[in-house]
Curated annotation (Swiss-Prot):
Source species: Escherichia coli
PANTHER family found in the cross-reference section: BETA-GALACTOSIDASE
Enzyme active site: 467 (proton donor), 543 (nucleophile)
Binding locations of Mg(2+) 1: 422, 424, 467
Signal sequence, start to end: none
Record protein name field: Beta-galactosidase
Length: 1029
């Protein structure tokens, strides 16, 4: 194969502007080099083997000159020769919007430009970058010097020393050009004109911030004239994986000589495992022969150490191009993982064993840097994923930074590599995939991804893109991948998740048991999908459990199904990280922004924040629920025997201790530690000693935790990987409390009932029927009366797609508003006081009404005895024709602000009725500030369920209830758009709920709280005791 001579359609800016390559779907590149795996062109095989920095690879990251223009036509021709006076300095890589030029736009489905493909607006923001640099003189004398742009959004033209070099688009894959003919001795100048919009933008309608610029690395690479132009490695096995073959196909370009040889050596650390040498000349392909510029070498490997996410064993393959006498011309290298992926009998298998995908979707996002990814952030993401029992990641919805795949190889994550194709805003969605004019553009996005990433063992599945419908173009691309790389399955959700263009049924947001009959592309329940006639493929949800704000309710139902049905092989949670961006107020204080905060239109508000972690990678409480449901050890208690089952496919437990503890109301009574010795997919029985039988009252709980005593590549020593709790018994008190000789005194006035006992007083307003005040000594305890509460500050899942300009009457919040739940007022039906032998009894009844209609009837009794305890009993009736309420509880504003909150119940993290399997029953003690979850969009938060006792300041509440406590009222949470605008109110707001509706999370745009977690009973009863410590 001979070197390609660049073509030059014209140097001038005027010629480029006239051609308008960015509005021609048939032009995806001009003079761009062919795709290949990342190169380093080592000139020393030892450096290639140890992956040392190559002297032939030079980074151009750093400060570049930059000028912004509203359209490419506004760029002066003189810019090609010299920097403009108005030019500033920006760092490359970066998004120019993060430097104050132009505005980022957040939109989900709607295109940010008028839909008229392939044309884009004449107002097309344009960034003009320039850089002066010198190159090593030896690079000019021989060989080829390339420039590599790893990511530019969305299209760009490149000049070097005033001469036009080429054009590229597809913002998420490299564009590489040969600069050899343009470089000169001394100083050289690059000029890069980046356009915000191009015809490629119609293929990049992903749910994300729309940003621009050179946002990935830029580098120079010097290769010899005769060079390795591509290499591909694959692993083959015998039936029991005891023998393997490393198959390496190497391609060269330049002057083909008989004396050229290729050596491929395989290394494990310092040990060479296998090696082979061959001249060029491929195997016979057809009657015309084979490829003269290619060679395939096959290296036999006995007892290979297999790669998996559990045990990411890696070898190193070094590919050397040399002469017959051994003189090295150049070397390339890559990590190799011996593993096999195939689908057999309806199951996705890795190394012969069925995978259970514990996956998450991940956008490349940084709150300060936009879409620029650095190694530290990538490693942080991987460590958090591994620590929280994720084993897979979907690159949603584009090929990621090249380093991401290397890190996934080394730390161990399964990767779905996804083409940069999404046309969600098209009507119909498949408009472009059924148009042959768009096949070249779509084809390059798929073929180049495969050619770049196919050497990575972590990549186990190719994806043809996201939400682009299904058409002839996708069918063609599916066939191309299956021809070129039959070693991996292909998945594609578009067109219904089960078309002919996918090997895996990969729906998004299909529910466990409920069908969703959408037009043309129904979403069956995942259980039903498996049983459809003729369907034999595995099902892996490409997106599920929409983690927007306070969400992930019902997550456990999915995992029950995954473990029950073998062909339900898991899924990818949507998604990993909140896509909020940092802005600064007038005082320089940072705050988290979402759609619309930059004046961007159109925008989809806070829909960009669906993460299991905040933008700064602080975990959401829901992450703990995901960790628990996905844990690799499962437990069953039978008598005094704990059965531990390992869901690891390849790992024998060699770094795990099982800690067990029996506690009564959080007080440890007995504990122990047992080393785990469990084979992959095996079991271990652990016999506990005779457990204590306490005589005192309380709940007896057995807790087991799996602890890793030693640090690993992804966790510190002491990491807890799995846990489970069982309630063994509940002993009731058999001793009567000591009789009090004091008797509370009741005073009745026209306005109030007042009860006094020592230094304590309780006041009930006879006009409202509420407990209006309490005193301890002369200190008031309440800032607002104790009232019924049936509402919550709406969650994202409660709001759904409803907004001011588009009301969705089916959304929970709109149903509550329409019924008057938020506007309901109490009509007093009864308020009486009685003096008993040793107590005072207050009896009240209220009808909560809106526009004359009764929504709730609440009947309460307050029994204040001689010990100062107030026992509250509540009975609530819900009108049959009103929507199920969000909660049934009590609310008040306490006068105190205490530093800490202590409770006996489920914790320590926020938990809700349909998201509490990860919470543990114990006695917890946290700062008041930790009881609030700082969701960027304020909403109901901080609930703790299963509470038996709550202590705050001088007060104690006992019973069986749920509570949240913070400095923010429900009203403020409802009226505030961003968390930084919240202000701490006087005192502390307390909600005590007898019952609370689930939060849902199957998706965030339709009501998704399962029926068993809705408050549909009609009648409710709860009680609690309020006293002072």
């Amino acid at each position: 194969m001979t070197m390609i001579t660049p073509s030059f359609p014209g140097n001038s800016l005027a010629v480029v502007l006239q051609r308008r390559d960015w509005e021609n779907p048939g032009v995806t590149q001009l003079n761009r080099l062919a795709a290949h795996p990342p190169f380093a062109s080592w000139r020393n095989s030892e450096e290639a083997r140890t992956d040392r920095p190559s002297q032939q690879l030079r980074s151009l990251n750093g400060e570049w000159r930059f000028a912004w223009f509203p359209a490419p036509e506004a760029v002066p021709e003189s810019w090609l020769e010299c920097d403009l006076p108005e030019a500033d300095t920006v760092v490359v890589p970066s998004n120019w919007q993060m430097h104050g030029y132009d505005a980022p736009i957040y939109t989900n489905v709607t295109y940010p430009i008028t839909v008229n493909p392939p044309f884009v607006p004449t107002e097309n923001p344009t960034g003009c970058y320039s850089l002066t640099f010198n190159v090593d003189e030896s690079w000019l004398q021989e060989g080829q010097t390339r420039i590599i742009f790893d990511g530019v959004n969305s299209a760009f033209h490149l000049w070097c020393n005033g001469r036009w070099v080429g054009y590229g688009q597809d913002s998420r894959l490299p564009s590489e050009f040969d600069l050899s003919a343009f470089l000169r001795a001394g100083e050289n100048r690059l000029a890069v004109m980046v356009l915000r919009w191009s015809d490629g933008s119609y293929l990049e309608d992903q749910d994300m911030w729309r940003m621009s610029g050179i946002f990935r690395d830029v580098s120079l690479l010097h290769k010899p004239t005769t060079q390795i132009s591509d290499f591909h490695v694959a692993t083959r096995f015998n039936d029991d994986f005891s023998r393997a073959v490393l198959e390496a196909e190497v391609q060269m370009c330049g002057e083909l000589r008989d004396y050229l040889r290729v050596t491929v050596s395989l290394w494990q650390g310092e040990t060479q495992v296998a090696s082979g040498t061959a001249p060029f000349g491929g195997e016979i392909i057809d009657e015309r022969g084979g490829y003269a510029d290619r060679v395939t070498l096959r290296l036999n490997v006995e007892n290979p150490k297999l790669w998996s996410a559990e045990i990411p064993n890696l070898y190193r393959a070094v590919v050397e191009l040399h002469t017959a006498d051994g003189t090295l011309i150049e070397a390339e290298a890559c990590d190799v993982g011996f593993r096999e992926v195939r689908i057999e009998n309806g199951l996705l298998l890795l190394n012969g064993k069925p995978l259970l995908i514990r996956g998450v979707n991940r956008h490349e996002h940084h709150p300060l840097h936009g879409q620029v990814m650095d190694e530290q952030t990538m490693v942080q993401d991987i460590l958090l994923m591994k620590q929280n029992n994720f084993n897979a990641v979907r690159c949603s919805h584009y090929p990621n930074h090249p380093l991401w795949y290397t890190l996934c190889d080394r730390y161990g994550l399964y990767v779905v590599d996804e083409a940069n194709i999404e046309t969600h805003g098209m009507v119909p969605m498949n408009r472009l995939t059924d148009d042959p004019r768009w096949l070249p553009a779509m084809s390059e996005r798929v073929t180049r991804m495969v050619q770049r990433d196919r050497n990575h063992p972590s990549v186990i599945i190719w994806s043809l893109g996201n939400e682009s419908g299904h058409g002839a173009n996708h069918d063609a691309l599916y066939r191309w991948i299956k021809s070129v790389d039959p070693s991996r399955p292909v998945q594609y959700e578009g067109g219904g998740a089960d078309t002919t263009a996918t090997d895996i049924i990969c729906p998004m947001y299909a529910r466990v048991d409920e069908d969703q009959p959408f037009p043309a592309v129904p979403k069956w329940s995942i259980k039903k999908w498996l049983s459809l006639p003729g369907e034999t493929r595995p099902l892996i949800l490409c997106e599920y459990a929409h983690a927007m704000g306070n969400s992930l309710g019902g997550f456990a139902k999915y995992w029950q199904a995954f473990r029950q049905y073998p062909r339900l092989q898991g899924g990818f949670v949507w998604d990993w990280v909140d896509q909020s961006l940092i802005k600064y107020d007038e005082n320089g204080n940072p705050w988290s922004a979402y759609g619309g905060d930059f004046g961007d239109t159109p925008n989809d508000r806070q829909f960009c924040m669906n993460g299991l972690v905040f933008a700064d990678r602080t975990p959401h409480p829901a992450l703990t629920e995901a960790k628990h449901q996905q844990q690799f050890f499962q437990f069953r208690l039978s008598g005094q025997t704990i059965e531990v089952t390992s869901e690891y496919l390849f790992r024998h437990s060699d770094n795990e201790l099982l800690h067990w503890m029996v506690a009564l109301d959080g007080k440890p009574l007995a504990s122990g530690e047992v080393p785990l010795d469990v084979a992959p997919q095996g079991k271990q029985l652990i016999e506990l000693p005779e457990l204590p039988q306490p005589e005192s009252a309380g709940q007896l709980w057995l807790t087991v935790r799996v602890v890793q005593p030693n640090a690993t590549a992804w966790s510190e020593a002491g990491h807890i990987s799995a846990w489970q709790q069982w309630r063994l018994a509940e002993n009731l008190s058999v001793t009567l409390p000591a009789a009090s000789h004091a008797i509370p005194h009741l005073t009745t006035s026209e306005m109030d009932f007042c009860i006094e006992l020592g230094n304590k007083r309780w006041q009930f307003n006879r006009q409202s029927g509420f407990l209006s005040q309490m005193w301890i000594g002369d200190k008031k305890q309440l800032l607002t009366p104790l009232r019924d509460q049936f509402t919550r500050a709406p969650l994202d899942n409660d709001i759904g797609v409803s907004e001011a300009t588009r009301i969705d009457p089916n959304a929970w919040v709109e149903r509550w508003k329409a019924a008057g739940h938020y506007q309901a007022e109490a009509a007093l039906l009864q308020c009486t006081a009685d003096t008993l032998a040793d107590a005072v009894l207050i009896t009240t009844a209220h009808a909560w009404q809106h526009q004359g209609k009764t929504l709730f009837i609440s009947r309460k009794t307050y029994r204040i005895d001689g010990s100062g305890q107030m026992a509250i009993t509540v009975d609530v009736e819900v009108a049959s024709d009103t929507p199920h309420p969000a909660r049934i509880g009590l609310n008040c504003q306490l006068a105190q602000v205490a530093e800490r909150v202590n409770w006996l119940g489920l914790g320590p993290q926020e938990n809700y009725p349909d998201r509490l399997t990860a919470a543990c029953f114990d006695r917890w003690d946290l700062p008041l500030s930790d009881m609030y979850t700082p969701y960027v969009f304020p909403s109901e938060n901080g609930l703790r369920c299963g509470t038996r006792e709550l202590n705050y300041g001088p007060h104690q509440w006992r019973g069986d209830f749920q509570f949240n406590i913070s400095r923010y009222s429900q009203q403020q949470l409802m009226e505030t758009s961003h968390r930084h605008l919240l202000h701490a109110e006087e005192g502390t707001w307390l909600n005590i709920d007898g019952f609370h509706m689930g939060i849902g999370g199957d998706d965030s745009w339709s009501p998704s709280v399962s029926a068993e977690f809705q408050l549909s009973a009609g009648r409710y009863h709860y009680q609690l005791v309020w006293c002072q410590k």
